[in-house]
Amino acid sequence: MMVVFFDSRTALFCHMVEIMLCAIIAPSPLEFIFLEFIAGLAAINSLKDLSRRSQLLRTAVLVFLTYSVGYFAIDILLTGSPDKLVPRMFGSFGINAVFVSFAYIMIFVVEKIFGFTSKVTLVELSDVNNPILRELSEQCPGTFQHSMQVSNLAAEAAHRIGANVQLVRAGALYHDIGKIENPAFFTENQHGVNPHLALSPEQSARVVIAHVPDGLKRAEKGKLPMVIKDFISQHHGKGKARYFYTSYCNTHPDEEVDPAPFTYPGPNPQTKETSILMMADAV
């Protein structure tokens, strides 16, 4: 479970602590530590990139084989003969493997109770048939294509620096969903008519900046996890709607301009992943 929500190193540390505590009451502590360590190592390695349910079945089989081979090897080393193998031990190994198969249910329960977001959920959110993404593609085709391109670019950058690739990919797909409210006010969705020509720079900035809070409202309605909402709120940080700010300054050269109406609410990116998105979005 730990490897699904955190990383392999954290999962291995927790597994080792658990083994040492349980070994205190184990009849054969050294054999117990060895078997549990290799089985846990196999499970962690198999589940570190969990993205499909079928991986749980593969992991269950791998855990059973690891237990069985380890037990057989220990028995041969200690007795020199397989005659003293205890058949019911293989039944215990099978039960442990079956418990691995139930991990998907536990992942769902833990996500709901503690608000964690697993890699499995991120993969599911990245499906372009998700209702929110489907609506984005229908209402804002230009924004949807932009989000796909930013997602690919950001995911590649995340891979290069060791950040959470799946989180960046999913976050990038949803970062501009607030544009669904006013698609024609964004250049990638315009087809010859620019509605900003009928607005003042302050009004235009207000409409453009609103796609951030609008996106958060839509994310809340769609029950998107907090880690995805962070990409929506932070992808512009506390930057300015630069074009409209500059336009206002040019038309009011003798006025001390208040930047607040042209400034995004933020906050600035708080993680590597949201920082990557901000840079990829600006390319």
Predicted regions, residues:
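Divalent metal-dependent catalytic cores for phosphoryl transfer on phosphate-bearing substrates
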Residues: 133-283
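Generic detector of multi-pass transmembrane helix bundles and their immediately adjacent loops
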Residues: 1-148
